[in-house]
Amino acid sequence: MSSVKFLAFADLHHYPEVFYTFAPERLAAIRQRAIDEKVDFVISLGDFGGGKPLDLLAEYAAFPMKTYHVFGNHDTDNMTLTEAIKAFDMPGKGYYFFDCNGFRFIILDNNYVNIDGSILHFELGNYFPHPNTREILPAEQVDFLKETVGASPYPCILFSHSSIERECDQTPGRPFRSAIINRQEIIDVINQANSRSPGKVRMAINGHYHRDFLRILDQVVFLDLNSASMEWVNNPHDHFDRELTAKHTYAANTVIYNEPLCAVITLDHDGTLQIDGMKGSFYKNVTREMTDNPPCDRSGRPCTANIQSVKMKMFYR
């Protein structure tokens, strides 16, 4: 029985002057787990770093197995797209696919914003003033997805930074930050492919929200992958030492995970899916509930220092 096994992590946020994530130590632990589990490849689901994390990018590229990136919104905060593609050694324009052990893995880049009618990639913070028109998959990529899935001889897995599964928050005056704005176009591509060939698109994995959640829609498994490092809170708290918050600009706007959260995912062609997650804990025992912030995000998902483990078998017909 043919299978593929990979390690996925998201939102490492290596930006030492801004966040206290001790990212080098986390990445080293992720590397060791990937070696111990004998995975076929490792993939970062975005927000690897917010500055110019060239040192850590080199360490990641030197893993003893294939490594891949998905662009996150913060990966181009201090770089142009051209600079980021070079720094991350990203194929093509930042979206691409690869095949491994009889599966096709498709990497999407939803980091686009509509500014005065122009669809532009996030870079150098250009999207910050436009919360209502950000997170878009351009038409070019929708076509790429349709063609890449349609031409695939293998079952497909999708990776993106933002969620395909979460519904957009269309409350007047509130930003569309819950999901990719044109997510329905992506869902339509998935459903059309699966109606022609059941099980053609089997799974979609995203980062970005720092949440642990799994949902099955129309026989597709959607995994909202937790951050490897921490959770952002809009209202700062005073539970960390002043020395720490003085050294790291936005440490007080985070609750931090002690463990480098990541998941080892195994897929078999017979429809078996296994996610081996992690149980973690909070740095200094400071949880989101202890801060002056809502306990859940807009989708009602709580902040935990875990990635769930699950084993299931999907039947496609």
Show where each model-derived region lies.
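N-terminal active-site segment of His-dependent metallophosphoesterases
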Residues: M1-D55
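Short active-site segment of divalent metal-dependent hydrolases/proteases
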Residues: H14, G49-G50, D75-T76, I164, ...
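Binuclear metal-dependent phosphoesterase catalytic core
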Residues: V189, R211-R317
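Short acidic, glycine-rich surface-loop motifs adjacent to enzyme active sites
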Residues: E147-D169
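Extended active-site neighborhood of metal-dependent phosphoesterases/phosphodiesterases
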Residues: P53-A151, N182-V201, R215-N226, M230, ...
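Short, well-ordered beta-to-alpha junction loops that form the rim of enzyme active sites
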Residues: N110, F159-E165, G207-Y209, M278-G280
